[in-house]
Structures are given as C-alpha cells and as structure tokens.
C-alpha cells in the first residue's frame, strides 16, 4: 500500500529528512483544524496568490491513489474544498466561524448517544 521509505529510494530528494509528499501530507491534514485555518487567515497567508495556488495544487489528495494516505479524509478534503472559495478564506479570520466549524467537527466525530 505505502511506498518504500525514502531512505530506501535514493532517487527521491529529501527535505529535512522527509519527502515532499510526506511534508505535503502532513500539511494538508493540518487544514482540517479550523483553529489552524483561523491562524493562517490572521497571518494573511490567504492574501498571498502563491499560497492560494498551493492550496489548489494540494487538491490532488482527493484522488483515490492519494486519499488513502489521509487519516481523516472527510474533514481534510472538505477544508481543502472550502479553501478554494475566496469568501471562506476571508470569513475564517473570525474566531466565531472557526469555533462553529470546530464544534460541528466534534459533533460529527462522536456518535450521538440515544437513551
């Protein structure tokens, strides 16, 4: 399923000991955290065209051969989808929206208990 470790593949360049894919995988999974999205917005990352283009590039994780590497594909891909919208990138700067998304995510992660 997974490819051999980078140390066994000398043809794959490393960045700080990790492959580009490993770094992108870790980063894209961070996008599932609404508080992190709020942080990126407050730091003005979403105002940078090159960063927005990078978010678009990361949509390759929605492809079946890559989605299997995501720990939480639903929230990760939903965040990536929302980040393609300029309005969302502007609105996530408000802590209220980040909080609302976090609460919704927690509700969806925990099965509801019935009496």
UniProtKB/Swiss-Prot annotation:
Write one Pfam family the protein is assigned to.
Answer: Med31
Q: Which UniProt keywords apply?
A: Activator, Nucleus, Transcription, Transcription regulation
Record GO biological process: regulation of transcription by RNA polymerase II
The lineage's top-level taxon is: Eukaryota
Q: In the record, what terms sit under GO molecular function?
A: transcription coregulator activity
Q: Does the keyword Transcription apply?
A: yes
Give the quaternary structure: Component of the Mediator complex.
Name of the protein this chain belongs to? Mediator of RNA polymerase II transcription subunit 31
Species annotation: Phaeosphaeria nodorum (strain SN15 / ATCC MYA-4574 / FGSC 10173) (Glume blotch fungus)
């Amino acid at each position: 399923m997974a490819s051999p470790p980078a140390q066994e593949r000398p043809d794959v360049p490393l960045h700080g000991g990790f492959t580009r894919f490993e770094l992108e995988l870790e980063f894209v999974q961070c996008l599932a955290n609404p508080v992190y999205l709020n942080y990126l917005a407050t730091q003005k990352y979403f105002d940078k065209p090159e960063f927005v283009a990078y978010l678009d590039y990361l949509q390759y994780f929605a492809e079946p051969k890559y989605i299997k590497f995501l720990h939480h594909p639903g929230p990760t891909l939903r965040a990536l989808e929302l980040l393609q919208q300029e309005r969302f990138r502007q609105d996530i700067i408000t802590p209220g929206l980040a909080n609302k998304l976090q609460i919704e995510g927690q509700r969806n992660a925990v099965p509801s208990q019935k009496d």
